[in-house]
Every structure is written in C-alpha cells, then in structure tokens.
Amino acid sequence: MANTAWLAFQKGDIASIGIDVSIASEYVNSSRAVFTGDDFVGSMQLQSNVEALKAREGENEDKEILGYVDFRKAISLAMNRDSYCATCTTASKAGFGLFNGMHYYDVENGGVYRNEDVAKQVLCEVYGVNVADYESLDAAYAAITGYNPELAKTLVTSAYAQAKADGVIDDDDKVTLVVGTAADTESTRRTYEFIKAALEAMVVGTPLEGRMVVKFDASFGDNWANDFRAGAYDICTGGWSGAAWDPGYFLLAYLSPQYMYSQAWDTSAETLAYDPDGEGTEYEELEMSLIDWYNCLNGASGAAYNWAEGQVENDFRLGIIAQLEKAVLLKYYSVPLYNYFSAQLRSFKIEYGSNTYNTFMGYGGIRYITYNYDDAAWEKVKESFDYKA
C-alpha cells in the first residue's frame, strides 16, 4: 500500500485514511481504527438467462447447469462467507440477506428490519436452521453461517443428474463459468481466486469432480453490470445500496427488470401465496405475482391494494417484506456474501464527537471534532506515532 495518501497519513499530514485489505491484519486492532457500517450488501450474482448461457457454450462445455436451482443453491452453500470477508474485504461481515442492520423500516423509532423476528425467521428458513433446535429464535439466527459444503455436494449431484436426464450435459462436458469484472486489479483477482477455489472444492466427490473450469474476464469495463444483465457472462459480484430508510421500496432492486441483475427471471410470472394479516379476518390467503405484491406494498398506481407506509401497520408491511426477501433468496440468482463495513485509521491529532456511528449523524461531523494538538505542537510529534498499536 505504498501510495501517496498512505505516506502522507503516516507523516501526519492528513486526518484519516482507509485501511486496505492488503494491510488489514496489521492495523485492524489499532486503537485508532474506526469501523463504519453501510447499507450496501455485496452479493454474488448468478446468470439467469439460460438461452444466453447455451449460446456461449463451446465444444464439450456446459453452462446451462447454472439454470438449475439446486446448482445455484449449491454455490451459495459452498461459500464460506466468514472466510470471504477475511480474504477479500478489510472489515466487512458475513451477510445472508438482502438487508443488513442499516435498513430502517421505522425511522422515527429506530426500527431496523433485520432485527425483527420475521426477518430473522426468514433467514433461518432459507439457510436450513431449525429454530426448534435452539433455545430461542435469536440463538438460531446467530447460528447461521450459510456454509454447508456437504449439502452443496449433494445438490451438485442432484442438479447434474437432472441436467443429464434433460440432455443438457454429457459425461465428457466440463462446466465452464466465467467470472466477469470491470478491470483486472488486485482486488478483483482476489475475489476471483476465492470464487474459483470454492467452486472447485464444491465439486470434489461429485460427478463433476475435475470438470469445473472457472475463468476470469476483466474486459467489461464500465458496462460490466449491463453486460451481465444481457447475458454476456456467468458470474459477477455486485450489490445495492440506497433506500436504507425504506426496505419495502428497496426490494425494487431485486424484483424490477429495470434494476435486477437476474433480468431473465420474470417476477410477473412468479407467484406468492400469503395471508398478510395472519390470523386477522380482513384478508384470506392471497396469491399474486411477486411484482404485484411489491406494487401493493408500495401503493403503486393501479395496484390491487394500497399497503404503503402509513396506510397499514408496520407489522403488516414487515411480513410482506420478509416473504418477498425469502422468495428472492430461494431463487439463488443473488447470493448475499457480505454486509459492507469500511475501515479507517484516525490520526492521533483528532477525536470524533462520538466513537459510535449513527446512521443519521455519522460520528458527529466536523462541528464536533476536537483536537489533541494545535498545529505547532503537531508538527513536532506527528511522525512519532505507531498506528499499529
């Protein structure tokens, strides 16, 4: 990390600097390290366009197996998210859902979607954690790892058998998947190598052992996301931030063709049956397409119901948000990997107004920064500090 900004920070000339993953192990335990949560959820996106997959197959190559949900689920379960975060990020934490702890459904009262029971229950169901095996829902939720390599192998075998029966793959075909990105950098290479190793390990002991080929293509530049949506390659890493105070609206990123990475998945044809008021009497079980549920949740023009914020109780909306999150996750086109945290070193010259990050106020802003040294005193000592301590 020998760049100009890093050298300037070490000399005491700038107040803070981000910690690069290449030096994270040396500095993450520093007394001057600051870790800040973010609403960004980083995911691995798996190609949904089976026709595009087939069109890009070479001789004795298969890509269409990615169209089988068992195979995509296997990929999800083959990802050790804790290891991914330690290898490919500086300070991010394993992520399992479309939302993290920075998504508020009730801003006035500090209500965080991910902290609600319905949101925890959904992730337990998606990742096969039986709540009855634990003392509480919270204990079951805390036990989620998203990593089950043995079940992943079983699912690979199942998907292979089905693909072979369907005439999609032959015994001499290799599964060839391309991880695409915008540029060839140390960071993108690190991510690619992690995914490659995970997929190769996933097929050991299955009919695809020795037949998994994972390639790297950094030629997509600024159009990498749209190229992926158009079916130009097989795997990318990307995600979404924004609408942190409206998780119901945020679902648009995963359900609307205008935004979703999995554009070949028709959410107007995928249905969800659900009773939105549970034991209530106003609604029986309703069955609508996913995008229709979304439109009702957000009070869209022409929607069958108006369940927008302020029109119904929060608990009513939370149940729908949770069901839509579950529906997206169970397709395994978007595989959450991490909840983004940034890591910075703060100069010994300054102190923030608060050491606890607040999504509305940050660390207090410039107004509340205090100084341990004036400029003259700082000049005398600024190069004497050890930022590893």
Locations of the language-model features?
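Solvent-exposed, polar/charged alpha-helical surfaces in well-ordered, non-transmembrane soluble domains
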Residues: N3-L7, K11, S25, V69, ...
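Detector for C-terminal structural segments
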Residues: S76-E125, A183-A197, F228-A389
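Ligand/substrate-recognition segments at binding pockets and active sites
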Residues: M1-N3, A8, V126-G242, S342
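Loop/turn elements at helix/coil->beta-strand transitions in domains of secreted/extracellular proteins
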Residues: G12-A15, D70-K73, N80-D82, D173-T176, ...
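Extracytoplasmic/secreted cell-surface and envelope-processing proteins
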Residues: A5-L7, S25-N29, M44, K54-E57, ...
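Second-shell loop/turn segments in exported
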Residues: A5, R56-L66, F71-A74, L137-T145, ...
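Extracellular/periplasmic solute-recognition and catalytic clefts
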Residues: M1-R56, D82, A86-T87, K93
